Structures are given as structure tokens and as C-alpha cells.
Amino acid sequence: MPDVPALMLSLSNTLDAQLRAAMQRAFPVADAVLDPQLAPASKPEFGDFQANGALPLAKPLKQAPRQIATAIVEQLQADSGFTDLCLEPQIAGPGFINLTIRPERLAAEVSARLGDERLGVPAVEQAAPVVVDFSSPNIAKEMHVGHLRSTIIGDSLARVLEFRGHTVLRLNHVGDWGTQFGMLITHLKQVAPDALETADAVDLGDLVAFYREAKKRFDDDEAFQSTSREEVVKLQGGDPVSLKAWGLLCDQSRREFQKIYDRLDIRLNERGESFYNPFLPAVIDGLKAAELLVTDDGAQCVFLEGVQGKDGKPLPVIVQKSDGGFNYATTDLAAIRYRFGAAPDGDGARRVVYVTDAGQANHFAGVFQVAERAGWIPDGARLEHVPFGLVQGEDGKKLKTRAGDTVRLRDLLDEAVERAETDLRSRLKEEERSESEEFIQNVAGTVGLAAVKYADLSQNRITNYQFSFDRMLALQGNTAPYLLYAVVRIAGIARKGGDLEVSTGQLQFSEPQEWALVRELLKFDSVIAEVEEELLPNRLCSYLFELSQVFNRFYDQVPVLKADPEALASRLALCRLTADTLRLGLGLLGIATLDRM
């Protein structure tokens, strides 16, 4: 896909087909690939689209590119479907064909979208089950700022895929298994022994402190260390008391995680690492059957193809340690098999997406290669890692508290809302506006959380990004408050008497600002298709920001409520479609909108 979103995906597909047919008619015996190379026009003065396919044909056809372009245009002009869609094509430069959509076709499309709750975005014809694996915090540890990116990027991608009509299984692969549970269960048995006899739930207070205490005892006390190791064996062996303690720890963590998810409006199905325990031996058997398994220093490994260590030898993916234990790679392979496996013994997915930090890229590349070579990825299915960079402080270093600790997600969200509230109260004072406490709390909560989400999603996820409350809460620039304010501005038109629900007959546009807004609005479907394919939410953010800017220029430069009667309905229609597009687009980012701020 081009970096500039195409004007209407359906238009672009129609034009592409018309151009191919015209090229075929112009050069029926050409021994060359006939590709129109259709792309959105790089500048408005070049029209809506540019077809650059004449240039690469010059050599095989032994003709000048402009001559080739002229022959293609003659065939286009003989196609009534094309002439109904476009104005007369212009040949520019060495042989570019510039194409402009007829204004009446654009106006008709705006009308169609006004009556379409999907705003011109079609549902996929062949919906496929998709697994999106995101968030995935560890039990007995609080969610920190590092979980923020996976959680909100994964949620946004899931929303876009759901909107397109796919059945999406949102999976939370929580870290609920492993040797650390030995020390946690031992500590729990010693500090809250009664809980194991009676309680269905236990309140351990600050989970981070509980984890730290257990870790300190494990590091300092050999007897505690020894008991912890025995506890791991008991847990893996299914000892009922150990399982009860493990369950209590998982439940408390789950309750804490859910508070964050509720606050961020995140839906997830928990399926922790422990779910795959029964399937781990079958992973080893499957790799053995595929003749991929090699014993190396007592461990069972698969050596990767095309990936060497510093010594020049192939790197191994260890799937069973020399003591017989399994590891993350084994669990991830079991998860891949299950997710692609046919129902009822699997999820039957056709696309599996992992949203984790870029530091895990090599791990997943290795695991994916092993799964591919073992034959566990069905033909035509897609297995993708969606990596993201670090959240940094304004000093460019990893974001930490003043004390040097990891920033807890709960604290970060609290501060965002508090700062949004301070900004709002200050603005109300300046404007001498009086609002209810309920209004202030609702706006501050919405703006604060929107700012945090949007600041993250608007960055290219692959890069690190610097976290700044001042930047993300600013009313100017590519921020959530700027976009939310555009929605508020349009809601204000209705409050001032503009009927945004007015039944519009044939829309009439004359001003360049109107046409700029029309063209921007009609890019929405191609942007959604791009995000679905490339899994980059920042493309949607960039589009919504550009749309807000184009709308603000239109609203500032062209009268709306004071427009002439014949222009009023059409301009109100543009306002309504802009608000609908912003609301839907922000909703797909997991961001709620407001009618007043």
C-alpha cells in the first residue's frame, strides 16, 4: 500500500481494472507486464490518482513513454465506465497519466456514507478467525508501563480486525506458571496459612511488595530456597494444597489486572501459560516425528536455518532442558499448534498476531521458524509478530520513577487524569465557565486516558517513544485533546441550531476547502484496510489528525451556520460525516469521545 492513503478503496480498485483493460487493448501482443502502477496523486494539482505504468513499458515496446501514455488514454476515453467516473485524463512529464474523479461521483459517495454506519468500509467477504495475543502480564507482579504498549496496541488491532468482520479471539497469555511460583507459594503458606484452609480469595495487599519479600527470602535464606524448589515439584505434580495456593495468587493478580482493563476499556480472554502444560509432551513428539530434534548437551533442540551465533554455528531453540523440564519456547510452540489447530481441539485460526516488545523479536523468529518447519502452520495462514519499542522518559532513557523504580501503570493513569483535571479547571477559570463536578470528572477521565492511549498509538510502534504528559495533553498538535476538540466543535454546531441530521438531497460543493474535506473523508476505507494489513495503528492516527486539520481549515474559512441556504445542507452534511468518521476512527483506537469539553 502507498504511504498516502488512496481516495476510496473501491474507486481505486475500479480504476486499476479499467487501466489494465485499456493497456491490454492498446498493446494486445505486448510481451511485457502490463501494470498501471496506480497510486494516489502526490499533489492535489495532479488530480486524485497517478498512473505511472507507461514508463516501464518504453524499453520492451521500443516507444516513447508519452506515446504509450497517449495510446492508453485513447482506450480509456473509449470506455464509458471510465468516462462516467473520471474527467479527461492529463498526460504529464515523461508519461505520467493524471486522473481526477468527477465531482458528482465524489458528492454521491459522501451521500452514500452519510447513510452507512460503516462509513464505506466493507465487511470482509471471507471472515477468518484471528488470534491477537496481547498484554500478557505476569502473575504476582503489578502491571507496569511496559505492559501499556502491548495492551493498547493489541486492543486497537483487535478492534480494527473485528470491525472488518473477522472473528477475533483476544488472548491474554499471562505468566501463570514457572519456577518463581515455588518461592511465592512457600511465602504464602508461611504468611497466610489460614487462607489455604478456608479462603476462596486472599488479600495480599501490595502484590509487588509480596513478590519482593518472597524474592528477598529466596536470595537470603537457604532453607527457604530449598523449600521453594520442593514446592515447584509439588505444584508440577498436582499437589492439591500447592494448587490451591497457586490459584489464590492467580486470582488476586487477576482482580488487579481487571481493574486496569476496566479502566482502559479492554476486553481479553485469559489463557495463561499453564493452559498449554498438557500439550507440551506432544510438542516434543511432533518435532521428533518431523525429524527436527537434536540432542545437544543432554537438551532437546531444533537448530535454526540461516541463523548463526558468534561462533558461526547454527543457533538452537531449546525445547526440553537436560533435566527434562520445558521452557518458554516449548509453551509458545504448543500455543501455536493449538491456535492453528482445528476446532474443537484448537482455535482454528487463520491469522495469529503476537503483540510484544521488540526485545522478543529473535525469540519469536526462532519459534515461528520451528513451527513452520514442523508443518504446524496451515497453508495460507499467517503468523505475525507485532513488535514495539520502549517507553522512554523525556531524557531518552527507559521510563522510571524518581526513585529509579519501574512506573506502575495504575500510577501513570492516575497522574494523566489528575493533570487533565488540573488543565480543565484552569481553562474553566480563564473562560469564566461554571461546570458540575460530575462534568469535570467525566471530561478529565476521558481526556486523560485518551491522551495516554493516543500518544502511544500515534507513534510508529516499532520505534521507542518519549513519554511526556505536557505533549500528550496539549490542545494543539497530533494529540487526543486536539482530535476530541474537533468532535466537540462539530457537536457545538448542533447546539447552535445546525441540524446535522438534516435530510440532504443532492449535495453541492463549490469551495476548494469543501472539496479538500470531501477527498479526505473518502480516504477512510483505504486507511482501515491498510491498518488491517500492516498492523500499524499510527496510520489511523495520522489520518484522523489530518482529517481534523482539514476540517478545521474548512470550518474557519467557509461559513457553515451563516452559509447561503443552498450551501447550508451540504456543509452540515460534511460536518456530520467528519464527526462520524472521527468518532468511529477514535473508537477503533479504543478512545471515547465527548460532546463538550
UniProtKB/Swiss-Prot annotation:
Gene from which the chain derives: argS
Substrates-to-products reaction catalysed: tRNA(Arg) + L-arginine + ATP = L-arginyl-tRNA(Arg) + AMP + diphosphate
Motif ('HIGH' region): 137-147
Gene3D superfamilies named among the record's database cross-references: Arginyl tRNA synthetase N-terminal domain (3.30.1360.70), HUPs (3.40.50.620), Isoleucyl-tRNA Synthetase, Domain 1 (1.10.730.10)
GO cellular component terms, semicolon-separated: cytoplasm
Record PANTHER family: ARGININE--TRNA LIGASE, CYTOPLASMIC, ARGINYL-TRNA SYNTHETASE
UniProt name for this protein: Arginine--tRNA ligase
The family this protein is said to belong to: Belongs to the class-I aminoacyl-tRNA synthetase family.
Main location: cytoplasm
BP GO annotations: arginyl-tRNA aminoacylation
NAD recorded as keyword: no
Compartments in which it is found: Cytoplasm
SUPFAM superfamilies: Anticodon-binding domain of a subclass of class I aminoacyl-tRNA synthetases, Arginyl-tRNA synthetase (ArgRS), N-terminal 'additional' domain, Nucleotidylyl transferase
Enzyme Commission (EC) number: 6.1.1.19
Taxonomic superkingdom: Bacteria
Gene Ontology molecular function: arginine-tRNA ligase activity; ATP binding
NCBIfam families per the UniProt record, alphabetical: argS
InterPro entries found in the cross-reference section: aa-tRNA-synth_I_CS, Arg-tRNA-ligase, Arg-tRNA-synth_N, Arg-tRNA-synth_N_sf, ArgRS_core, DALR_anticod-bd, Rossmann-like_a/b/a_fold, tRNAsynth_Ia_anticodon-bd
Subunit organization: Monomer.
